[in-house]
């Protein structure tokens, strides 16, 4: 009995590996000719592949040739059975009757494997040429966890929000905040302080005042410093680079937190956890630049967030990418470290979105998210300029911590160096 089913049954299936049209049942599962051929060649030639990334590349009909390692892992995970191959009935390569002229081999690409062509082992940079491989390598096994980084970020975000809603808000300098232990990694601390305060519950809505802005910005800046310390790459930086990276994110990350955690009371309303809210209502007592920031939050962040309908995992990853910005005024070695971590998370985010939606939808949502980051960077530059102007004219009474965050803390830097 051959692995392939009758042609009539193939119309009812798609390929479980790449979601293309299945030509029938091959090696136990519905699959297309390309994935069937790829799986057979991998087993028969005892080929071994490696992934250039983290073993979580998307595999579908549009990019199934991108990573052979992840494609083969997908074949195994959906149930393709290597024992279904028959040595005498599954030859690899061309017979005398079907052998192609040599001149055509020159144009054979890696992706031609989907048409049943035999690709020379030396073509792919992902392919190794080791001694014969142990059969244990090909035993069916589940794929590596695809969301390990994103799951960590999502869990971290939940802890951060629990702390945001608690009573805990220490008074400390920026240097103390950045050099102390990471509270979000302290299980005992979170068990003690991770309960929501009665103050941070919505009983009724009231229009925001200056004290509300001050209170919630202080809380979100405190959370920003704690959030930063959860990244290993951040802890590897020297103090000056840490301070500059946090300073660069002092507008964008709190904006994301405030928008994401706001209950939906309409398209132009952001609500804090205690019921204070702001909308497009003019606030003549606030500096013009900060009023402009309010409108930008509604237009550039709130509306796109609601349109994209991000889930908690996507938000946590986007927040991390926003924070890990190599455009901050940090040293070159720090910039390389931060950028590498940012790229790593960005790849995971795209892979997650590609698994969640069809390819076209995933690409569109990912592109809109990236463009939103660009708009937020522009908003942050304008808002920081507004903060400097407000401080110059003494329109706002900044706390000592806020002044150190926005304008620098030379005393702490000197003390750190000593």
UniProtKB/Swiss-Prot annotation:
Q: What GO cellular-component annotations does this UniProt entry give?
A: nucleus
Domain NR LBD, first and last residues per copy: 170-409
CDD domains with a match to the protein in the record: NR_DBD_HNF4A
Q: Which UniProt keywords apply?
A: DNA-binding, Metal-binding, Nucleus, Receptor, Transcription, Transcription regulation, Zinc, Zinc-finger
Q: What's the domain of life for this entry?
A: Eukaryota
Q: Cite a single Pfam family from the UniProt record.
A: Hormone_recep
Q: Name one GO biological process term.
A: cell differentiation
Q: Where in the cell is it found?
A: Nucleus
Stretch list, region Disordered: 89-130
What residue spans carry the region label AF-2?
Answer: 398-409
Tissue expression notes: Expressed in germ and intestinal cells and at low levels in the hypodermis.
- Report the SS bond pairs: none
Among PANTHER family, the record links this protein to: NUCLEAR HORMONE RECEPTOR
Annotated family: Belongs to the nuclear hormone receptor family.
From the Swiss-Prot or TrEMBL record, give the protein name: Nuclear hormone receptor 114
- Lineage of origin: Eukaryota, Metazoa, Ecdysozoa, Nematoda, Chromadorea
